[in-house]
């Protein structure tokens, strides 16, 4: 274990700092974790995931979440990432007295870089674009009159795993970059 000689510099928290508010939903977040688990253990990635699936019950996600040699804050329940370059995480109380796992941006960056290396080897421009080009299927059509319609569009009960994973990954990458540039924490809000 490495002990720092000096404390970390505080970051500024006020209502004047810019903020970033985009986030994936649980289906997309779970798809990203599933791709991470499948690629880590060299297993095939399922082509689809069910709508509202309970991703924590998937055997490969559960295996990676408990793997003592491969520790990812994303799989250990982190909900806060502090703007620190070192990679570590810990459990601590929030101001609400709820306990949460708190990690660092340095650790999140390493995890996201590892996932990209395992799954896609995409450059940053491609990654940033996935939030706009990947994700959920269209839930409606734009008619000739310019009106949006859901007529004749079946409800989706399955989603493309890779597309959802890329969508979530892009949002996490964007949040991480923003947090690094602005020196602000990332907080998952659910």
What annotation goes with each model-predicted range?
Residues 4-182, 190:
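Acidic (Asp/Glu-rich) sequence patches and key acidic residues
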